[in-house]
């Protein structure tokens, strides 16, 4: 929000509007003489005018959480009420920007103050007022038209990827008395004037919205389109939908951040909001360094991924209270782009740090601790955040659909999934990608454990798969069965060795190894494997399962005859086929293209059928 427009202590002539600091404990300040203040109202604390938010009222005493460092605040310092809730500015200029937890633009602050740290009490508006945007009004709007909340009345081409649709704020309506002609305007220029019941209102391209309030929609719709991540193990076995909620819990070093970054790089979303909430500063700087260099192809033109990304950075050394706000800031930005009709993905890395911030502030307020010292309302807060996801029909005209998908990384201490944050999250989200320390130690990445992970969206997506990839659902079921059987056989193998197993079981073990090493494992740092399109995923799985079926059939049909086929015979004769199966992943979707890869996989299937025929003859 625009902190420069909030009232200042020195401008205030009436002393009666001040409260006074009564006590300071870390980021929590208590103030007296605050009668008339509202819950979640923004205040300015002390002579440095630090931004804070009221989180508890008792008589005329208010408890305030301050979003900046409170050193130097003393008892008796003035506290000024602003009468506004914590809000964000929504308008052109969000994409490609990087904000802190309360939407202060970090690059603008650094260029104005020439400092690598954020000075205290800094006043900078979130969206720059110096940039002129080219505003194109809607064709069907003219003076006298009626317009209600959510209607799109103009378009700004923010960059070559994002058409920023300028919408009327949800609670306004009226008839148009003025609409700006096409031209260049900055974010504070009036582009629309409405009259409703004799009252005139002016609107610029920027709207302000309180972060703790959900943006209204016409109706919620069932999700039915997959969120393709480009990671085979996730797309094939545990799919998420556009508008779904996902948790990625895992111990340190399991690759949570790499998965959430690859989601932001390669997923089929239109807009990415990446909230780094209490994680290392290096991870945010890595995102800032990598994303501008990464490109995607849109209509034959190569575009930087940063053009569809906004970052909310709140690293572990920034004030704790702002960490709690950063999640709300991120989800409000996501809902705004959803209302334009885009599919938005929001990455929260990591919600555990956010819960720790809640725990710290709750401890300062001397509230009754629940499990592991977290506050009793932890589950409710998590739910209120995750429930803002979903696929919706947006308010206003023209009719459009949008969605917000939330992917929350959770880092339980010691990788223990019974930790309160993880268990509360799992009760809310629909998809669980559980990362396994043992797999990560074996350098099997992405280290998603296929036995404990699950997705509740399988049924919802069946219709989509039947339409586009008819053979996929039975393939997935078969692959899961093979992996499960392999897990059951592993115990027997440890006791009696591989040699004494039945021939069909040997095939199961070998194909499971093939699936694990050459299908589920994926190297995110190579050009051919960092992103795997869905047709390639289906093609690879199809050939592996076909090999399994043919090998089993060959063994079972010749079991009674004299020249029976065993697994060792298959392995001897099919060395080349097995090699080709395990090198299917080296086909580069960018260089080779879809048609060539599909043709190669079909050719491999034909070779396989011929090899089995000659073996049986």
From Swiss-Prot:
Its EC number is 7.1.2.2. It is a peripheral membrane protein. It holds the Pfam family ATP-synt_ab_Xtn. InterPro entries: ATP-synt_VA_C, ATP-synth_a_Xtn, ATP_synth_asu-like_sf, ATPase_a/bsu_AS, ATPase_F1/V1/A1_a/bsu_N, ATPase_F1/V1/A1_a/bsu_N_sf, ATPase_F1/V1/A1_a/bsu_nucl-bd, ATPase_F1/V1_b/a_C. It catalyses: ATP + H2O + 4 H(+)(in) = ADP + phosphate + 5 H(+)(out). Its main location: cytoplasm. ATP hydrolysis occurs at the interface between the nucleotide-binding domains of subunits A and B. ATP hydrolysis triggers a conformational change in the subunits D and F, which induces a shift of subunit d. The c-ring is subsequently rotated and results in a continuous proton translocation across the membrane. It comes from the Eukaryota. Phosphorylation at Ser-384 by AMPK down-regulates its enzyme activity. Catalytic subunit of the V1 complex of vacuolar(H+)-ATPase (V-ATPase), a multisubunit enzyme composed of a peripheral complex (V1) that hydrolyzes ATP and a membrane integral complex (V0) that translocates protons. V-ATPase is responsible for acidifying and maintaining the pH of intracellular compartments and in some cell types, is targeted to the plasma membrane, where it is responsible for acidifying the extracellular environment. Belongs to the ATPase alpha/beta chains family. PANTHER family: V-TYPE PROTON ATPASE CATALYTIC SUBUNIT A. This is V-type proton ATPase catalytic subunit A. It comes from Mus musculus (Mouse).
């Amino acid at each position: 929000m625009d902190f420069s427009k909030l009232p200042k202590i020195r401008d205030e002539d009436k002393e009666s509007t001040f409260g006074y600091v009564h006590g300071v404990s870390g980021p929590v300040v208590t103030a007296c003489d605050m009668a008339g203040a509202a819950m979640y109202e923004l205040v300015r604390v002390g002579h440095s005018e630090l931004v804070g938010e009221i989180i508890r009222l008792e008589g005329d005493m208010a408890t305030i959480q301050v979003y900046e460092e409170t050193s130097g605040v003393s008892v008796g310092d003035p506290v000024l009420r602003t009468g506004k809730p914590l809000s964000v500015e929504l308008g052109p200029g969000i994409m490609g920007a990087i904000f802190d937890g309360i939407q202060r633009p970090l690059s603008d602050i650094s260029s104005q103050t020439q400092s690598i740290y954020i000075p205290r009490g800094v006043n900078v508006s979130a969206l720059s007022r110096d940039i002129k945007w080219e505003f194109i009004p809607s064709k069907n709007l003219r003076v006298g038209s009626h317009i209600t909340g959510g209607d799109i009345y103009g378009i700004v081409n923010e960059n070559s990827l994002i058409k920023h649709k300028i919408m009327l704020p949800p609670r306004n309506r009226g008839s148009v008395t003025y609409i700006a002609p096409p031209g260049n305007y900055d974010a504070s220029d009036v582009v629309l004037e409405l009259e409703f019941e004799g009252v005139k209102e002016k609107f610029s391209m920027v709207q302000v919205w309180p972060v703790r309030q959900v943006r209204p929609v016409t109706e919620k719709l069932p999700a039915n389109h997959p969120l393709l991540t480009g990671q085979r193990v996730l797309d094939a076995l545990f799919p998420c939908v556009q508008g779904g909620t996902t948790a990625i819990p895992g111990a340190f070093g399991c690759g949570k951040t790499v998965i959430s970054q690859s989601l932001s790089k390669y997923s089929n979303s239109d807009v990415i909001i990446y909230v780094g909430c209490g994680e290392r500063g290096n991870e945010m700087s890595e995102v800032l360094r990598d994303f501008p260099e990464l490109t995607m192809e849109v209509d034959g033109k190569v575009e930087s991924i940063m053009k569809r990304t906004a970052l909310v950075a709140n690293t572990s050394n920034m004030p704790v209270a702002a960490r709690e706000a950063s999640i709300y800031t991120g989800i409000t930005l996501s809902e705004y782009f959803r209302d334009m009709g885009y599919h938005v993905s929001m990455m929260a890395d990591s919600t555990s740090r956010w819960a720790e911030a809640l725990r710290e502030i709750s401890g300062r307020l001397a509230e009754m601790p629940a499990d592991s010292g977290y506050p009793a309302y932890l589950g409710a807060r998590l739910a209120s955040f995750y429930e803002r996801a979903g696929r919706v029909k947006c308010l206003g005209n023209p009719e459009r659909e949008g969605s917000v998908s939330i992917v929350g990384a959770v880092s339980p201490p010691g990788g223990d999934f019974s930790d309160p944050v993880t268990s509360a999250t799992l009760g809310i989200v629909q998809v669980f990608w559980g990362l396994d320390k043992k797999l990560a130690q074996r350098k099997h990445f992405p280290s998603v454990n296929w036995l404990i992970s699950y997705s509740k969206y399988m049924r919802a997506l069946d219709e989509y798969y039947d339409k586009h990839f008819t053979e996929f659902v039975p393939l997935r079921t078969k692959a899961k069965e093979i992996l499960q059987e392999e897990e059951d056989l592993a115990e027997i193998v440890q006791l009696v060795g591989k040699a004494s197993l039945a021939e069909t079981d040997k095939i199961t073990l070998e194909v499971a190894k093939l699936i694990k090493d050459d299908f589920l494992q994926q190297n995110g740092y190579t050009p051919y494997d960092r992103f795997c399109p869905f047709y390639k995923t289906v093609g690879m799985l199809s050939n592996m399962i076909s090999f399994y079926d043919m090998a089993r059939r060959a063994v079972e049909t010749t079991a009674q005859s004299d020249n029976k086929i065993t697994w060792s015979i298959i392995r001897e004769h099919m060395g080349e086929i097995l090699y080709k199966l395990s090198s299917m992943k080296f086909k580069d979707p960018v260089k080779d293209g879809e048609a060539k890869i599909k043709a190669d996989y079909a050719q491999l299937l034909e070779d396989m059928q011929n090899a089995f025929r000659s073996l049986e003859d």
